[in-house]
């Protein structure tokens, strides 16, 4: 019902007609109000109506995690966890675990989304529990230890289990488990939009996307950037890519080169691999490449490909290893963790996250819809993965052209996505070099090299010394420094020039 009132007459002239009209208007408005037909006042542009604000606050409070089983004392930061529905029709929802910044002024700290790749591996079980999260799982699988180098000491960290089908995240529609790169990026963007609607006070924070996936991170970054003018506003500033496949052709060459240079494969296998594998897909390799790859794995023996110079776990293989071996028909030991050194650390996380009281505290699997035991990676997602880009260089060019902060890093003991692969792929971008390859240190006065770096126009590459595929696992201090430098937009610290000795100035070895 709409009521339109028109009046005539000059201002300041009260007549019987206007008096009657006013009386009639008041009567009509009173009747409309009594019938509930009047609309509420329109809220200010950009501000949700009051009842929406109350709903947001209630959702936040419902997601608040007061504490976790076995949690140590001294935890001063807030935590939230729960589900964000991204498709009502299919019943598709992603799980998240959010940790507020453990800083003097968390309200001023940036927001960082962390994703693990695989595809199909858990950002909670790997990223949060083994790499950069505030806790480490004790060897008893029931209690937690504080992580001295937790990344939430510099930023608010949001871990998301994506896509649906990765452990706690789920869908009521089985076809949703057949994923691909583009669908993954769009689903995760939808998650972000809805998460920001639930936590609107983070909309204008500096926002970054980070993780261990050369596909998920740049592809999601591209979607976020292209939707920069849509609502809600996301203050997207840059991306941090770890150990990521970038260009299948260059990555494949770099892989066989590293295997050979480290004495892991024969001359014949290197030559065969360089002949038949470049140009094939990592996710869907040709039979010819698979045959050579299997020969290479047999020659390597029982090593951990994610960190080739550390001992392997003597327990059953972890699902995480299938990301590397499964396309070629072989399993291998699980990823490692330092410090303290524990080659079977992944099983501590598996035990802890399967405890019913832990899942209850995390607000995970509250309906019991996830019937299978929690595991670090989803074989279903990995085995059914479809569309996978073979070249991410055009995406990088677009993001660099947009002026976003772009950093890439990888460990030098990783044989899965080795330094040689990443450097070849980045070289293919043909970016001008701002600062040539140099050693960096944990502080300008440190004598021991922390790693190496090169700065291009629009992109920075960092290689922490002695790190494997999961850089924060093996070199947590270096990884944390790298993260802080990335957030500040500052290069890795170089040693003062006058502290560097030329070969002629060094003492003899005898």
UniProtKB/Swiss-Prot annotation:
Disulfide cysteine pairs (residue numbers): 121-377, 277-289, 313-344
Glycoprotein as UniProt keyword: yes
Short name of any one Pfam family annotated for the protein: Peptidase_S10
GO function term, MF aspect, one: hydroxymandelonitrile lyase activity
Keyword 4Fe-4S carried by entry: no
Recorded family membership: Belongs to the peptidase S10 family.
Descriptive protein name: P-(S)-hydroxymandelonitrile lyase
């Amino acid at each position: 019902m709409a009521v339109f009132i028109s009046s005539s007459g000059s201002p300041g002239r009260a007549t019987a007609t206007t008096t009657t009209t006013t009386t009639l208007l008041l009567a009509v408005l009173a009747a409309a109000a009594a019938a509930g037909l009047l609309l509420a006042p329109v809220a200010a542009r950009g501000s949700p109506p009051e009842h929406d604000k109350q709903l947001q606050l209630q959702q936040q409070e419902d997601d608040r995690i007061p504490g976790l089983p076995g949690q140590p004392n001294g935890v001063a930061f807030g935590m939230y966890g729960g589900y964000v529905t991204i498709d009502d029709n299919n019943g598709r929802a992603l799980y998240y675990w959010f940790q507020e910044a453990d800083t003097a002024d968390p309200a001023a700290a940036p927001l960082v989304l962390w994703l693990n790749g695989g595809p199909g591996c858990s950002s909670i079980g790997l990223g949060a529990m083994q790499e950069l999260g505030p806790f480490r799982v004790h060897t008893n699988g029931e209690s937690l230890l504080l992580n001295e180098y937790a990344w939430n000491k510099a930023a608010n960290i949001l871990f998301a289990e994506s896509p649906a089908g990765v452990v706690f995240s789920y869908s009521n529609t089985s076809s949703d488990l057949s994923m691909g790169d583009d669908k993954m990026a769009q689903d995760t963007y939808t998650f972000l939009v809805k998460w920001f609607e639930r936590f609107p006070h983070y909309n204008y924070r500096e926002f970054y996307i980070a993780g261990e996936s050369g596909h998920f991170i740049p592809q999601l970054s591209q979607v976020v950037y292209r939707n920069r003018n849509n609502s809600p506003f996301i203050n997207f500033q840059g991306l941090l890519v770890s150990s990521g496949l970038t260009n299948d052709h260059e990555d494949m060459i770099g892989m066989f080169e590293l295997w050979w240079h480290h004495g892991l494969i024969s001359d014949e296998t290197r030559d065969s691999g360089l002949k038949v594998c470049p140009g094939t897909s990592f996710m869907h390799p040709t039979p010819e490449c698979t045959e050579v790859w299997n020969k290479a794995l047999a020659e390597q023996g029982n090593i951990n490909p994610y960190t080739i110079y550390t001992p392997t776990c003597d327990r059953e293989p972890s699902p995480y290893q299938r990301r590397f071996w499964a396309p070629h028909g072989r399993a291998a030991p699980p990823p490692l963790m330092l410090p303290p050194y524990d080659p079977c650390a992944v099983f501590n996380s598996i035990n802890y996250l399967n405890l019913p009281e832990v899942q209850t505290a995390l607000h995970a699997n509250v309906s019991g819809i996830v019937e299978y035991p929690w595991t670090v990676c989803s074989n279903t997602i990995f085995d059914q993965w479809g569309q996978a880009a073979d070249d991410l260089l055009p995406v990088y060019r677009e993001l660099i052209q947009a002026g976003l902060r772009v950093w890439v890093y990888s460990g030098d003991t990783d044989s899965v996505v080795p330094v040689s692969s990443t450097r070849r792929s980045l070289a293919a971008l043909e970016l001008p070099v701002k600062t040539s390859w140099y050693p960096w240190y944990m502080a300008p006065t440190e004598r021991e090299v922390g790693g190496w770096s090169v700065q291009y126009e629009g992109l920075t590459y960092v290689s922490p010394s002695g790190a494997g595929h999961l850089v924060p696992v093996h070199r947590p201090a270096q990884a944390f420094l790298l993260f802080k430098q990335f957030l500040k937009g500052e290069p890795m610290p170089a040693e003062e020039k006058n502290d560097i000795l030329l070969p002629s100035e060094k003492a003899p070895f005898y």
